[in-house]
Amino acid sequence: MDMTQARTFLPAIEKPEGLMMKLAYFFTWRQFGKVLTPVKVHSARLPAAFGMFYGKIGQLDKKLTLPREMVFLVREQVARINVCEFCMDIGRSFTIQASMNQAKFDALGEYGTSVLFSDKERAALDYVAELTRDKNVKPETFARMARHYSEREICEIVWLVASEHVYNMTNIGLNIHSDMLCDISRKKR
C-alpha cells in the first residue's frame, strides 16, 4: 500500500466486487497508469451510478465554450483554495498532457500581479476566488467579470466552481491526497 492510500480515512478497496467496478478499475488504470485513490476509497463503496455521475461532469465539461486552458485555470483555482491535493494533482496532470503553459499554472497563486494572466482571466479568477472562499460575490466583482464574458460563459464558470467543489469535498472528506499523477504524466511525455 502506498502512502496516499495509508492516509485516507477509509481503507482503499484493492479488489472490487461487481463487474462495473472492476471495469472502472481497469479503465482508470489504463488511462492513468494506476487505479485512482478516489475510485478505491469512495467509488468502490457506492453503486455504479455515483461513479457515472463523476464521469458525467467530465462529459459536460466537453460542451463548454470557454477555452480549455480557462476551464483548467478555474478548476485549479478552486482546488487550490480548497486545498484538495488530489484535485490539484489530477488537474495539473491533464494540463501537462495537453501541453499547456505550466508556468502559468505555477503562477496561479499570483494571478493578480503576474504578467502571464490577462485582465479577462484576472476578472474570472477574482470571481472564482471570491465565490469559492467566501461563498458570496460582491456586485463589483461580478460586474468586472461580466465585462469580459458572455452570459453563457459566466454560467459555465459557475458550473466549473460548483462541480469542482463536488470533487474537492469528496476527496477532502475522505482525506484523499495526491496520487502523484503529475509525475506519471511527465514520464509519459
Question: Which residue stretches match the model-derived regions?
Answer:
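Short acidic alpha-helix initiation/capping motifs at coil-to-helix transition points
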Residues: 48-53, 83-87, 131-139, 161
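Iron-sulfur (Fe-S) cluster-binding segments and ferredoxin-like electron-carrier domains
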Residues: 46-49, 88-107
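Acidic/His metal-coordination segments adjacent to aromatic residues that form catalytic metal sites
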Residues: 108-119
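Preference for long, well-ordered alpha-helical segments
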Residues: 151-188
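Short, thiol/selenol-centered motifs that function as redox-active sites or metal-ligating centers
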Residues: 71-92, 164
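Short alpha-helical scaffolding segments that buttress acidic/His motifs in well-ordered protein cores
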Residues: 73-78, 108, 124-132, 157-168
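Mobile cap/lid helix-loop segments that border enzyme active or cofactor-binding sites
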Residues: 1-68, 96, 189
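Acidic/histidine-rich alpha-helical segments that form the ligand environment
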Residues: 119-159
